[in-house]
C-alpha cells in the first residue's frame, strides 16, 4: 500500500479491520518487534492516541500518522489545522466525512478481506475519462447543463467553449454547494465537473445521488481544472510528463494543502512569460481557441460534452 498524499481516508463498517489496523501500528510503536507485528515502511509509522495528542503531534515529523475515529477531536477545526500545516502524512480511520479537510476522491479506501489476507481498495473508481460512479452506468441522453464548482477561470473556459451550443453552463460557486444545486434541478440532465483533488468529503453523497439519477446525472472529477490544462498538451515546449505521472514525487505536502494547490502554482509559474499566462480569475484567450479547447475537452468528453 502506497501513501501518495498528505491525507488518506480509511472507512468501512464495524468489523472490517479498521481499528485492528490502528491497534497494530500502536502496538508496534510501543514495543517494536516484541509486539509480534511486522511493519515495513520507508518512513516512520506512528499511531496518535487520545491522550495528549497535541504534544504527540509536535514530536512527529516526516512520518505517517494513523488516527482512529476514537480520537475525540478528530473532526475538529483544531485537528484539521494540525493536519494541514504539518510535514506528516495522515491516515484517518473514520466512517464520517471531514468537511474541513481537502482530500482526494482517489484517496478514500476500504479494507477488503480475502481469507486471512487484507488489502486496501479504493472506495470510488475512475470509470473512464475521470467519470466516477458507484455502479457502472452511462447517460442515455445528451446533457442540458454543465455544472462546475467555481465561477472563475474554469467556468469561463466552459462557458466560452459551449457559447454556440445548446448546452448551458452553470456554477455552483463552491464544491460544497454541488449537492444542493443538484437537489434543486432533478428535471435537468447535468454533467458535473469538479476538482477531484479536494472532493473527497462530498463524493459519497453526490455519487449516491447520481446513482439514483444515473440516466440524467454524470459526475466528472479530474484532479483540477489546472491539471486538465496541463494534461491537454496545448502548451508547446512544456515538458510535464514526469510531474503528471508521479505528482507525489514533486509535491511537498507541508507546502501544498492539496494537489489542486500544487497544479495551480505549477501552471502559473510555467506559463508566466507566454500567451498561456495563467490567472485563476480570468482564463487566457490562448486556452479558448478552437483546437486548444477541443484538446482540453477531449480529456473529459461524454456524449454532447466535447
Which residues fall in each region the model found?
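Conserved glycine(s) of the Walker
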Residues: 16-18
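Post-Walker A alpha-helix
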Residues: 21-23
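Conserved P-loop NTPase "ATPase switch" module shared by AAA+ and STAND
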Residues: 52-77
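Acidic, divalent-metal-binding catalytic cores of TOPRIM
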Residues: 72, 111-306
Amino acid at each position: 500500500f502506497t501513501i501518495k498524499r498528505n491525507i488518506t481516508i480509511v472507512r468501512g463498517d464495524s468489523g472490517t479491520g479498521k481499528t485492528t489496523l490502528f491497534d497494530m501500528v500502536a502496538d508496534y510503536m510501543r514495543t517494536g518487534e516484541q509486539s509480534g507485528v511486522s511493519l515495513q515502511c520507508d518512513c516512520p509509522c506512528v499511531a496518535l492516541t487520545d491522550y495528549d495528542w497535541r504534544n504527540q503531534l509536535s514530536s512527529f515529523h516526516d512520518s505517517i500518522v494513523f488516527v482512529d475515529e476514537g480520537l475525540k477531536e478528530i473532526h475538529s477545526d483544531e485537528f484539521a489545522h494540525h493536519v494541514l500545516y504539518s510535514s506528516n502524512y495522515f491516515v484517518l480511520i473514520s466512517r464520517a466525512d471531514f468537511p474541513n479537510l481537502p482530500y482526494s476522491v482517489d484517496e478514500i479506501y476500504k479494507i477488503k478481506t480475502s481469507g486471512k489476507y487484507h488489502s486496501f481498495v479504493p472506495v470510488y473508481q475512475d470509470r473512464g475519462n475521470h467519470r466516477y460512479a458507484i455502479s457502472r452506468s452511462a447517460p442515455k441522453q445528451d446533457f442540458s447543463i454543465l455544472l462546475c464548482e467555481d465561477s472563475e477561470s474554469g467556468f469561463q473556459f466552459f462557458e466560452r467553449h459551449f457559447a454556440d451550443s445548446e448546452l448551458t453552463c452553470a456554477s455552483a460557486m463552491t464544491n460544497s454547494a454541488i449537492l444542493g444545486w443538484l437537489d434543486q434541478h432533478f428535471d435537468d440532465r447535468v454533467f458535473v465537473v469538479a476538482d477531484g483533488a479536494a472532493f473527497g468529503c462530498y463524493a459519497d453523497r453526490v455519487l449516491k445521488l447520481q446513482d439514483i439519477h444515473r440516466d440524467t446525472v454524470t459526475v466528472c472529477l479530474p484532479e483540477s481544472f489546472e491539471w486538465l490544462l496541463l494534461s491537454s498538451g496545448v502548451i508547446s515546449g512544456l515538458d510535464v510528463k514526469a510531474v503528471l505521472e508521479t505528482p507525489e514525487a514533486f509535491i511537498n505536502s507541508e507546502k501544498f494543502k492539496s494537489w489542486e494547490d500544487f497544479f495551480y502554482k505549477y501552471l502559473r509559474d510555467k506559463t508566466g512569460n507566454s500567451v498561456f499566462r495563467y490567472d485563476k480569475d480570468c482564463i487566457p484567450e490562448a486556452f479558448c481557441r478552437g483546437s486548444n479547447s477541443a484538446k482540453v475537452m477531449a480529456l473529459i468528453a461524454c456524449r454532447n460534452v466535447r
